[in-house]
Amino acid sequence: MIANWVNQFGKSKTNKLIDYLNQSHGTDLRINLPIDKVESRLLDQGISWSNSPNSKNFIRINSGLRKILSSQIHLSGKVFVQNRAAGAVVEILNPKPSETILDVCAAPGTKSIYIFQKMNQSGNLFASDINSSQVAKSFKRCNDLELSIDWKVKDATKDIFPMADRILIDAPCTGTGVISRNPDIKWRKDSKDTDKMSAYQIKILLLPEAQVA
């Protein structure tokens, strides 16, 4: 893996990447309320956090994550545990109200929820995943939050999807981009895994592209 990085990025950038991935970066939290309304609730629970440098919709939790997960503010959908990079993907998609959007390979649905909220809950969001149990959990979560996202079990390599204005495909991957959160990936993945996953990703990416209106 390191050899591939050196070939692709050069030694200097690879060393910087390794240094970054060997560090702990805390947990990101997406907020659906003005920060001043969230701040007091976090402080009351003794939770340490800091602002995200490039988004008013995210903060970084430094300590107290377990308190967040069991808090009413989290259970009611006022805040979501969501990686800042995953949120940036939704912002690049730039969903608009009244559009029809596909979210493919969407479970567990955190990005789907962000997309629908960006749409002001107006329009059609079709979310799908091949894992039926994950789809059931995602549907229940959205239903509990009163979000009318249309969840379906679909195989993105062969099933038919509705026409859409925009498509987000979070294709399955080797996970090497999140080594800082899952360091054991360094020892569990090799070049064969990468080649196999790349071929699978291409099959997924080619099928829904014809569904963009």
Q: How would you name each of these model-derived features?
A:
Residues 1-213:
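S-adenosylmethionine
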